């Protein structure tokens, strides 16, 4: 394919990036009660809630944040009383993160928002199309992670 025949808007990576940005715009966690959290904080809360206990490095990786973004989100969530840090026994420099009781309540709201957002995104797809889409996205992710 030459540059003359290239169509940026039909490029898979361009489409996926645009879709990710559109999803982020729909990820409004600011109305959550009893606290307001950012999109990054919402992802961190969801990752910890789903996995139960993780290190800061694991959280950043699973939430697709760089280490500094992950650390800022963790500090903010600790300050808001939504997650707690416990020093790891095997490494005094490392901490395990888990949800507090208040964090578990907010996590339930975050999950409800994620499910609602997924329902909106997939509403015109049949169950078979939804499964096919997820399978294809998983294959693409595998290709990129292993290349």
Protein language model features and the residues they cover:
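C-terminal regulatory/oligomerization modules of transcriptional regulators
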Residues: 1-5, 128-147
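Residues within helix-turn-helix
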Residues: 56-57, 68, 75, 95
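Charged, amphipathic alpha-helical coiled-coil/dimerization segments
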Residues: 24, 30, 75-138
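N-terminal leader segment of winged-helix/HTH proteins
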Residues: 1-35, 82
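The alpha-helix within a helix-turn-helix
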Residues: 60
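Short alpha-helical "packing" element that flanks the helix-turn-helix/winged-helix DNA-binding module
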Residues: 44-45
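Short capping segments at the starts of secondary-structure elements
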Residues: 51-55
């Amino acid at each position: 394919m030459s540059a003359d025949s290239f169509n940026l808007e039909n490029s898979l990576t361009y489409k996926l990036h645009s879709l990710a940005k559109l999803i982020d715009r729909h990820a409004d966690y600011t109305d959550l009660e009893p606290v307001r959290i950012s999109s990054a904080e919402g992802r961190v809360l969801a990752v910890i809630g789903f996995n139960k206990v993780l290190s800061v490095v694991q959280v950043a990786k699973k939430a697709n944040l760089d280490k500094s973004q992950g650390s800022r989100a963790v500090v903010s969530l600790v300050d808001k009383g939504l997650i707690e840090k416990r020093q790891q026994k095997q490494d005094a420099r490392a901490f395990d993160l888990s949800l507090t009781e208040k964090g578990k309540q907010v996590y339930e709201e975050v999950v409800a928002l994620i499910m609602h957002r997924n329902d909106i995104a997939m509403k015109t797809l049949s169950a078979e199309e939804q499964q096919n889409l997820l399978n294809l996205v998983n294959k693409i992710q595998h290709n990129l992670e292993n290349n």
